Amino acid sequence: MEHTYQYAWIIPFVPLPVPMLIGVGLLLFPTATKNLRRVWAFHSVLLLSIVMIFSIDLSIQQINSSSIYQYVWSWVINNDFSLELGYLIDPLTSIMLILITTVGIMVLIYSDSYMSHDQGYLRFFAYMSFFSTSMLGLVTSSNLIQIYIFWELVGMCSYLLIGFWFTRPLAANACQKAFVTNRIGDLGLLLGILGFYWITGSFEFRDLFQIVTNLIYNNEVNLVFLTICAVLLFAGAVAKSAQFPLHVWLPDAMEGPTPISALIHAATMVAAGIFLVARLLPLFIVIPYILNLISFIGIITLLLGATLALAQKDIKRSLAYSTMSQLGYMMLALGMGSYRSALFHLITHAYPKALLFLGSGSVIHSMETVVGYSPDKSQNMVLMGGLTKHVPITKTAFFLGTLSLCGIPPLACFWSKDEILNDSWLYSPIFAIIACSTAGLTAFYMFRIYLLTFEGHLNVHFQNYSGKKNISFYSISLWGKGGLKTVNKNFCLLTLLTTNNESASFFSNKTYRIDENIRKMTRPFMTITHFGNKNTYSYPYESDNTMLLPLLVLVLFTLFVGAIGIPFNQEGMDLDILSKWLSPSINLLHQDLNNSMDWYEFVKDAIFSVSIAYFGIVIASFLYKPVYSSLQNLDLINSFVKTGPNRIFWDKIINVIYDWSYNRGYIDAFYATSLTGGIRGLAELTNFFDRRVIDGITNGVGVMSFFVGEGIRYLGGGRISSYLFLYLSYVSIFLLIYYFLNL
């Protein structure tokens, strides 16, 4: 075992040769390097697979031995200061290593096909491999300085990947927004690290925990300053994990390629913030009010993310807000001190979310064959629908990922989310009510995404429908955007609500019109042969096997990964692998490791949480599933939506909710007005002060000198006798004044 741990330092550097060799190859041998691009993709997958095997071996040893291994090299700079570099292998590290490598391999395999026709194929794989290196270095770091170095590298890689298609203004703006927003958190992280070094004199985690605990116990430290430093550390996690109020970069990050979205949202960048809080949890526990702040930020984020996902039209942005909400659950669990629940949800959420993003990429890929390369159209759920018969494998995988995120047993997220909900009742009933309500919202918006994407008819082909048997009824939608329409009985309600009629659209105040030449569009930034004018398709088609294989593997993880945390410890049967895995870290937190639960208590709690999820699913199915065809012989819809004052009032309320959700809670607009506008106003004021005051003084002195010189030049005639006469005259005047003043 010791022999294996000794070589763990190599883990972050295994994927590093790929970006280095690609960079050197493109610089020295560009043609040959581009011709061998599939070879570089193979090596990217191969090297990350080696890291995965190594990580699995380390994890097995962690489970069997319940030990923590740390190795440190000391770099002595002088007698007063030495910098220690090393690596730390504990349960948290091994969990993150497996998440990063397994999800990363699936994304790399998927990307080989998804990015195959992109001119930046090699650049993409270089960025991805360096991203993996940065994240692996982050999770194996043994001190705060190493964490900060790799933290910044992760931020740099995310900037490059979000702005991968930098020629698109939206992508360029999105990567800048992510970069600037994360700089705010990174500044807090740096100040917090320096503050704790000033207090403790060490960057090492163990020294930090012990010294701070002793200082607080002996009342030898200023608690206010200590709390401020802890809040600054937490600010770094808030920005990186897209927690309120620094969450605004996450939806815009969807401008990058879809495989990047899967990697960022499942196992890398957003998980880094959760990892940091989990790593520093022994420190946060002993500092007053920090856990309360963490849980408060978590509960706000999970509710805000769920509500903002309700009205999004872009499939990737909807999933982005879903990620934000689920990260809020993890942060809430950490704030409650539920270390096991938070990491359990981190594991179970990673695979379904990667599955959903890769599934959405498959949907987008198939839609581009119809609408061309236009993210506004290929990612717009208004134009989708009826994809079940066109992409059946993608549909099945996406459906299972949706069920998992909704918390339906026995899929992965059910086990972890149910555990967080149970812990929340013990922590705060108010927080528990919000968390349970958000679970219902999660089921609602996830099934909304699924139904709009796969059920009904392909809306991009729908123009107008006319039939023989028509009836009039008031079209309903969640957002009260309906009107009196003529509808054929044999046509679905959902298709009707997305038509280009005079009344408002199902999703916005303005009708979404489809260009007549939409199928003749080509990619402005990619060259894909079957997307040209010669080979167009009337309907989407299923992705190739290279893209489907990762989906199927992630389906297996989604089905079975929750089994590692099943809390049934009966006589002669110990199924709780996760608690055994996390026992060293839980012992460090001085928490009770006994997590057993009898069947009756578990089933009772599970029925409640699953009932909430099913309630959200039923509401989503009623509003979004094309049920009208099955109710065509009943007049339920017309009787349900009678017009009147109550209906009008309800529509107004729903419109307000819709506008608030669709406009991201007006938070981006507030930041643009207050922060961006304020900084711009300050810049204009500074420019005015610089040009009018500073430059005015400098230029004024020059102008005054010029006029004084000119005046003197005209007074002087060039005769010395005149100068002497003026000099004596002035001296005489001053003498007379002095004489009269002294009388």
Curated annotation (Swiss-Prot):
Might you name a Gene Ontology BP term for this protein? electron transport coupled proton transport
Give the stretches traversing the membrane: 9-29, 40-60, 89-109, 125-145, 147-167, 184-204, 219-239, 258-278, 280-300, 396-416, 425-445, 548-568, 607-627, 723-743
| One Pfam family named in its UniProt record | Proton_antipo_M
Q: Which InterPro entries match?
A: NADH_UbQ_OxRdtase_chlpt_su5_C, NADHpl_OxRdtase_5_subgr, ND/Mrp_TM, NU5C-like, Proton_antipo_N
Topology relative to the lipid bilayer, per the entry, is: Multi-pass membrane protein
Q: Where in the cell is it found?
A: Plastid, Chloroplast thylakoid membrane
Leading EC class: translocase
Tell me where on the tree of life, at the top rank, the source sits.
Eukaryota
Q: Please classify the protein's predominant subcellular localization into one broad category.
A: plastid
Q: What EC number(s) are associated with this protein in UniProt?
A: 7.1.1.-
What GO CC annotations are associated with the protein?
Answer: chloroplast thylakoid membrane
Keyword Membrane annotated: yes
Q: Which residues form a coiled coil?
A: none
Please report which protein family the annotation says this sequence is part of. Answer: Belongs to the complex I subunit 5 family.
Subunit structure, as described in the record:
NDH is composed of at least 16 different subunits, 5 of which are encoded in the nucleus.
The entry's protein name is NAD(P)H-quinone oxidoreductase subunit 5, chloroplastic
Species assigned in the record: Carpenteria californica
Q: Which gene encodes it?
A: ndhF
